[in-house]
């Protein structure tokens, strides 16, 4: 969708939205850009799980999600994180609406074939009609990373993956993956640009690890599937690291 910008907010990033962030959103809207946000909430999910004495586990950067963890994830994402984001927009008189998998089955997903991960899903389809309808009315959409399978079971979906799938489905002109670091680091230095075919090498040499592994895998998917530009950064003003299709690392 021409002139569409997708922004993924990490759990911590969503709690620290600055005036500069909102000024950039307002500027883009004045330029007739359409804005979609996909939010995470891992920090708050972990905090709630610990408070409820539910074990917190991850595997290859993904949260292990049993039935209890899934219910906590839904509660935190839809009941805490998303309302905080939409309220921040409303305070600035910016039209916004929160969406989740329960809205027209927005994100269809299949359960990942890994019994250790539990109720973790991979998106198979993004139903863009509702999103496009809202964008046509200049309403910003804020999407929780939860999917629903063919049996109408809810699944936890990695927020980076969800954002990249949404951006690809909309053929977005840009995708910003906002996180708590200013870009992908090689030691103390930020890598300006990464080619999708160089990501495996960065992983095997331990330049990327932990949660950055699925983040870069998702970014590579977006870069190779219709998204104009993909940027990993900590703010909309920071150039961060650009992920490009098969371009040498600089």
Curated annotation (Swiss-Prot):
It catalyses: N-acetyl-L-glutamate + ATP = N-acetyl-L-glutamyl 5-phosphate + ADP. It comes from Listeria innocua serovar 6a (strain ATCC BAA-680 / CLIP 11262). Disulfide bonds: none annotated. Keywords: Amino-acid biosynthesis, Arginine biosynthesis, ATP-binding, Cytoplasm, Kinase, Nucleotide-binding, Transferase. Catalyzes the ATP-dependent phosphorylation of N-acetyl-L-glutamate. It is an enzyme of class 2 (transferase). Its EC number is 2.7.2.8. This is Acetylglutamate kinase. Belongs to the acetylglutamate kinase family. ArgB subfamily. The record marks 8, 215 as: Transition state stabilizer. One of its GO terms (cellular component) is cytoplasm. Substrate binds at residues 41-42, 63, 156. NCBIfam families: argB (TIGR00761). The lineage of its organism: Bacteria, Bacillati, Bacillota, Bacilli, Bacillales. Pathway: Amino-acid biosynthesis; L-arginine biosynthesis; N(2)-acetyl-L-ornithine from L-glutamate: step 2/4. CDD domains: AAK_NAGK-like (cd04238). One of its GO terms (biological process) is L-arginine biosynthetic process. Gene3D superfamilies: Acetylglutamate kinase-like (3.40.1160.10). It is found in: Cytoplasm. GO terms for molecular function: acetylglutamate kinase activity; ATP binding.
């Amino acid at each position: 969708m021409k002139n569409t910008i997708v922004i993924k907010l990490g759990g911590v990033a969503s709690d620290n939205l600055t005036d500069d962030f909102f000024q950039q959103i307002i500027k883009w809207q004045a330029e007739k850009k359409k804005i979609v946000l996909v939010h995470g909430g891992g920090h708050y999910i972990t905090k709630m799980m610990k408070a409820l004495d539910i074990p917190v586990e991850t595997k290859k950067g993904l949260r292990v999600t049993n039935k209890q963890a899934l219910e906590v994830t839904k509660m935190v994402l839809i009941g805490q994180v998303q309302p905080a984001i939409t309220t921040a927009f409303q305070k600035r008189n910016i039209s916004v609406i929160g969406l989740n998998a329960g809205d027209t089955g927005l994100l269809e997903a299949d359960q990942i074939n890994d019994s250790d991960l539990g109720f973790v899903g991979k998106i198979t389809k993004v139903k863009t009609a509702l999103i496009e309808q809202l964008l046509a009315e200049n309403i910003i959409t804020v999407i929780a990373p939860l999917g629903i399978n063919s049996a109408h079971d809810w699944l936890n979906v990695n927020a980076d993956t969800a954002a990249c799938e949404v951006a690809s489905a909309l053929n977005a002109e840009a995708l910003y993956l906002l996180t708590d670091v200013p870009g992908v680091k090689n030691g103390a230095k930020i890598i300006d640009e990464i080619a999708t075919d160089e990501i495996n090498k960065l992983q095997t040499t331990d330049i990327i690890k932990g949660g950055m592994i699925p983040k870069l895998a998702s970014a590579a998917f977006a870069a190779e599937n219709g998204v104009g530009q993909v940027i990993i950064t900590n703010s909309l003003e920071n150039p961060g690291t650009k992920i490009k299709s098969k371009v040498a690392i600089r």
